[in-house]
Amino acid sequence: MDIKRIILYVIVALLAIALFNAWQRDYPPTPKPTPTVEQPTANGDHPTAYTPPAFTPGAAEKTKKAGTIAFTSKVPEARLITVRTDVLDVEIDTQGGNIVSAKLPKYPVSLEEKQTPVQILSGEPNELYIAQSGLTNGNGQPTTVQFESEKKQYVLENGQNQLIVQLTGRAPDGLLVTKTYTFHRDDYAIHLAYQVKNNTSKPWQGSLYTQITRRQPPTEHHHFYVRSYNGASMGSPQTPYEKLSYESLDKQNIDRTSQSGWIAMQQHYFLSAWVPGNPELTYHYYSHVIPASDEPNVYVVGFVSPQMNVAAGSEAATHATLYVGPEIAKRLKGLAPGLERTIDYGWLWPISMLLFWILSAVHAVVKNWGWSIIITTILIKIVFYWFSAKSFRSMARMREMQPRIQALKERHGDDRQALSRATMELYRKEKINPLGGCLPMLIQVPVFIAFYYVIIESVQLRQAPFIFWIHDLSVKDPYYILPIIMGLSMLAQQWVSPTSPDPTQQKMMWILPVIFTVFFINFPAGLVLYWITNNVVQTLQQWYVNKTYESHKAKLKARRARKRKR
């Protein structure tokens, strides 16, 4: 095995280490929730934690004080409305009409807890994460409305495709407000509509604000790995996708205007996002940080619509859309341009999207994500076969040149310049590119990285089974069988590869599979499955190239001879 293959494996190993670091950074071990003790309210109702006030630009000091007090308050269950569809379980507080809880019944927290759905929004103080909306007055101050509804429970029944939850109330300035949430079957997008009726004798001015309020979630450090990204993001026609980490929001608030766009809070596999109702209007996007002394800070991100002017006796309407659910590109792309970029495929996003499209097309046929990974990997290796074959043959040519290079070393001794000139002349004469063995393989590295992100970021692979003992491709193999098979596949690859006369290089190449096996123990099973398939196909390709190398070389010589005759 020549030194170039060792260099190539070292490069791949370093990439794997970087990817593993990224995995630990983005998805550290899930911290245990802090237990909370609920205190009974004065009226005996069972309380639910919640933060009512809304925060909009222009009232920094007031909102800081109000927010600090509100985060420790409770709201009785008597104020809650429950809404259940086939994909969402939602709680709405009639004070303000905000969504204070959202669960996803089709996404259990784990295979061991199938009856416990993933909860995106929560009103608990230690994990505060709510979707707020309301009206501001002419001075930009939010107004809190106590709403009423016809029912306390709304359920999307069989045969229904739409569920409407209508709230009515009167603002402190006498305005009659109707707030309507519309839910649809198999849809995580919630349509919000505000209707304002000015029954007063004075004109009214105000705007719609929508925002997401979230306490920074707890994180854990894993050895030397830095913590994950779990924060805000936004998009606009100018910048389709922009991450807004908690650290950046601490340093500077968002304060910008844009037509259309969106604002969101992300986490692994899921997100919540507000999308303006009219893409032709200009909205003001903002953020606000509420410091906390004993707990993580609370972050507010949102937007305000253009001001509405409602004459006395007149009406006006405005609307927006809230998405609370999984990061599925097809769903997100239909809501707002760039929202699908919240599926964090990294800087190779276009390649990752293409690979996911292929993976999905294969899955539509085989109905198993594990087999889809295997088949997609085989297709990738077929597409890149020309590069692999060129690399294998180039390395074979370099090995053939080793005796002649050794002779040059003996002839020129310590004269490095003369040795370099003689070596390059030999390469030129024999038409050998010294980098020909590495470059074709390196071209494939971006595809490996892109496919890595597809496997770890696509919610479709979350809790997706393969065969036998693999019940979840997004987590490590519980019995470490796949990493062992991966190590054996690397040993098979070494077996079909021509060996180097250097005993040190031979030992290095046989040690690498052991190192990689240990290294891949904690990787997601889907990623290890991809690596196994890649190794097996590459081993077969190298075996075929080795078998046909002499005939290929003879054809090449004959072709060159014909060219010289011309």
Swiss-Prot record:
Membrane spanning residue stretches:
3-23, 346-366, 369-389, 436-456, 509-529
Which molecular function terms from Gene Ontology are attached?
membrane insertase activity
User: Which terms does the UniProt entry file under GO BP?
Assistant: protein insertion into membrane; protein transport
What cellular component GO annotations does this protein have? Answer: plasma membrane
Q: InterPro entries, from UniProt?
A: Membr_insert_YidC, Membr_insert_YidC_N, YidC/ALB3/OXA1/COX18, YidC/Oxa/ALB_C, YidC_ALB_C, YidC_periplasmic_sf
**Which compartments is it annotated to reside in?**
Cell inner membrane
Function in brief: Required for the insertion and/or proper folding and/or complex formation of integral membrane proteins into the membrane. Involved in integration of membrane proteins that insert both dependently and independently of the Sec translocase complex, as well as at least some lipoproteins. Aids folding of multispanning membrane proteins.
Question: What protein am I looking at?
Answer: Membrane protein insertase YidC
Species of provenance? Coxiella burnetii (strain RSA 493 / Nine Mile phase I)
What is this organism's lineage? Bacteria, Pseudomonadati, Pseudomonadota, Gammaproteobacteria, Legionellales
Gene that produces this protein? yidC
